[in-house]
């Protein structure tokens, strides 16, 4: 699971889910990528599930890049607890993903298998996604 080793503050404010992605909107490492179309919080478990779905489908010969990292804690109070008594304890680690962000990238020689692997990974994520291909002029 992806979690930070140490953080300066254990509890943070909830991040905003408005606006477009400021960077990371183009495929820069692999040939194909998964791009977010709606905003969402992606947990470390969802990132891991998508990674496993991709790598199991392509088996060997490909390379996967993960471009998001769950660096924000989300807190939760226990069930049947009265209001007050401070903020709850950290439960999940999330990555705040804005529309347009390329979250995963994949390099694989066969386009059909690569697209199927990315589709399987996109089904594990909590937002609408699309598969994008690297353009000829991109970095």
Curated annotation (Swiss-Prot):
Complexes and interactors: Part of the 50S ribosomal subunit.
Transferase as UniProt keyword: no
Stored InterPro entries: Ribosomal_uL16, Ribosomal_uL16_bact-type, Ribosomal_uL16_CS, Ribosomal_uL16_dom, Ribosomal_uL16_sf
Gene Ontology terms: biological process: translation
Entry keyword set: Ribonucleoprotein, Ribosomal protein, RNA-binding, rRNA-binding, tRNA-binding
GO CC annotations on file: cytosolic large ribosomal subunit
Name of the protein in its database record: Large ribosomal subunit protein uL16
SUPFAM superfamilies assigned to the protein according to its UniProt record, in alphabetical order: Ribosomal protein L16p/L10e
Region Disordered, annotated ranges: 1-25
Biased composition (Basic residues): 1-20
Lineage: Bacteria, Bacillati, Actinomycetota, Actinomycetes, Kitasatosporales
UniProt record similarity statement: Belongs to the universal ribosomal protein uL16 family.
């Amino acid at each position: 699971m992806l979690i930070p080793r140490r953080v300066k503050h254990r509890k943070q404010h909830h991040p905003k889910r408005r606006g477009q992605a400021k960077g990371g909107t183009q495929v820069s490492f692999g040939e194909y990528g998964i791009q977010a179309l709606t905003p969402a919080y992606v947990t470390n478990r969802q990132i891991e599930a998508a990674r496993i779905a991709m790598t199991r489908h392509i088996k060997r010969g490909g390379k996967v890049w993960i471009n998001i990292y769950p660096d924000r804690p989300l807190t939760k109070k226990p069930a049947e607890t009265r209001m007050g008594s401070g903020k709850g304890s950290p439960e999940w680690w999330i990555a705040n993903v804005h529309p347009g962000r390329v979250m995963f990238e994949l390099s694989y020689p066969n386009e059909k298998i690569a697209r199927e692997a990315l589709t399987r990974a996109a089904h594990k994520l909590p937002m609408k996604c699309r598969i994008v291909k690297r353009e000829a002029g991109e970095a």
